[in-house]
């Protein structure tokens, strides 16, 4: 069975095929307790374990649990036992919360919010032969039918992610003389790429990665901070679910950086892939085309949600195109009408340049897929990377081809992907600078574009994963 996680998470060395019980990938130091002697373990018929001490006393042993917090994105669980990691990130967990709400008193219920990505919407539209707008409205109807209170479009949170990426690039470009690691700036929306960078290249590569949060995590801030205030609720009273094209988003949501210590809650409580939503529809016995449409919800009064929106620049969010246009205008006073992509070795590695009188002013690139990411990093290490900005995505062909997207058994994958791309492109594109409600939230929620609040809620940080040297790595 193919792993649903990205290639960047799966591929490390050649000796990567291991069973989950063969090696411990995250050793835990166990303190030896004084006076402890030899004990026996008894296994009962029901599968429970009991420790039998020398004095005849017994103690029931608790089962060890592995959650996403334990994940190092290393060569063990992700390769051979990823199902162990996602017990708290599945449609079954959503069903448990909805069932608990039905049984609880009104004061004890949690407000359930679902945020749907444009990529997942396009994949579902292809499967059900609907247009993206009808898919969005019928999906809203379905979620509300099973007990969800609000359904949002993550294209709205992507406005903020794009705007912050634009501003960060301009700041770094202007300050590159003072900071050797200012450029190139590498996009940060792909969690598979981030996990790979933290684990494999650490302190060398991390200063180059944009600190702007991904659309999923910006939506987490919007829902658990702004929207919670509007609803007069604490963040822990909201259960926030996102629908994403990628299994790696489950790992992103589980990062400690996105955990609210004060209220003991995550910005995103549960991530469902497109495929998991499809299974949820099947389990509920619902045919999406048969549902009556319902309008999407708006996060604030200034934001219209009559129909879903998207952005120019491709199915991975359009980071290269939006940063390129903004930088050309802001730094050089040049308005770019059309962005021209130049394919290099393959379609997943393309370049864009801004030239004036024969001089290259801006040199951008997009690198999709693990092979191209490795080539990019090697060029950086050799000091031969000519780019100012790179849109990096772990999946070949980008997010529309994510591991969590729906597959068609009776249709070639390339043909299906092209169909999903066409459907994705049918949605009205909106410039983040002109999006209704965005500037209102910058003013009233974030207290300005460069405020401490904006930095805290729209940006993040990265952590190099130290490689533990243990006897488990020895081969005899």
Curated annotation (Swiss-Prot):
GO molecular function: 4 iron, 4 sulfur cluster binding; metal ion binding
Binding site for [4Fe-4S] cluster 1: 24, 71, 74, 77
SUPFAM superfamilies on file: Fe-only hydrogenase
Domain of life: Eukaryota
SMART domains per record: Fe_hyd_SSU
GO cellular component: cytosolic [4Fe-4S] assembly targeting complex
Annotated signal sequence range: none
Tissue distribution of the protein: Widely expressed.
InterPro entries, sorted: Cytosolic_Fe-S_CAF, Fe_hydrogenase, Fe_hydrogenase_lsu_C, Fe_hydrogenase_ssu
PANTHER family: NITRATE, FORMATE, IRON DEHYDROGENASE (PTHR11615)
Protein name per Swiss-Prot or TrEMBL: Cytosolic iron-sulfur assembly component 3
Native organism: Homo sapiens
């Amino acid at each position: 069975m193919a792993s649903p996680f990205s290639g960047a998470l799966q591929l490390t060395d050649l000796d990567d095929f291991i069973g989950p019980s063969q090696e411990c990938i995250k050793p835990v130091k166990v303190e030896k307790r004084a006076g402890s002697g030899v004990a026996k373990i008894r296994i009962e018929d029901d599968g429970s374990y009991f420790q039998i001490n020398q004095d005849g006393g017994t103690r029931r042993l608790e089962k060890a649990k592995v959650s996403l917090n334990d994940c190092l994105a290393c060569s063990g669980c992700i390769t051979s036992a990823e199902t162990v990691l996602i017990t708290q990130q599945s449609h079954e967990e959503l069903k448990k919360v909805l069932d608990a709400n039905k049984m609880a008193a009104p004061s004890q219920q949690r407000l359930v919010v679902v945020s749907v990505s444009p990529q997942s919407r396009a994949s579902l539209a292809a499967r059900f032969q609907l247009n993206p707008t009808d898919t969005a409205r019928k999906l809203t109807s379905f979620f509300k039918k099973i007990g969800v209170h609000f359904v949002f479009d993550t294209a709205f949170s992507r406005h903020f992610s794009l705007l912050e990426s634009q501003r960060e690039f301009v700041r770094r470009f202007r300050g590159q003389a003072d900071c050797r690691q200012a450029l190139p700036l590498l996009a940060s929306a792909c969690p598979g790429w981030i996990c790979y960078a933290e684990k494999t290249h650490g302190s060398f590569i991390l200063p180059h990665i944009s600190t702007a949060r991904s659309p999923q995590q910006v939506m987490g801030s919007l829902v658990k901070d702004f929207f919670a205030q509007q609803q007069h609720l604490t963040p822990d009273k909201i259960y926030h679910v996102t629908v994403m094209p990628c299994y790696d988003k489950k790992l992103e949501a589980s990062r400690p950086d996105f955990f609210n210590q004060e209220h003991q809650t995550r910005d995103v409580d549960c991530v469902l892939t497109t495929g998991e939503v499809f299974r949820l529809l099947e389990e509920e016995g619902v045919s999406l085309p048969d549902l009556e449409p319902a309008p999407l919800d708006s996060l604030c009064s200034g934001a219209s949600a009559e129909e879903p929106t998207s952005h120019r620049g491709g199915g991975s969010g359009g980071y290269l195109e939006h940063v390129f246009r903004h930088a050309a205008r802001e730094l050089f006073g040049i308005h770019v009408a059309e962005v021209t992509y130049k394919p290099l070795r393959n379609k997943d590695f393309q370049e864009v340049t801004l030239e004036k009188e024969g001089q290259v002013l801006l040199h951008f690139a997009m690198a999709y897929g693990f092979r191209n990411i490795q080539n990019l990093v090697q060029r950086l290490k050799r000091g031969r990377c000519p780019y100012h900005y790179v849109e990096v995505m772990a999946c070949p062909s980008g997010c529309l081809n994510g591991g969590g997207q729906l597959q068609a058994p009776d249709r070639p994958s390339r043909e299906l992907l092209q169909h999903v791309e066409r459907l994705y492109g049918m949605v009205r594109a909106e410039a983040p600078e002109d999006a209704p409600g965005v500037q209102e939230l910058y003013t009233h929620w974030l207290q300005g574009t460069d405020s401490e609040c904006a930095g805290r809620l729209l940006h993040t940080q990265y952590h190099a994963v130290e490689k533990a040297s243990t006897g488990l790595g020895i081969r005899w």
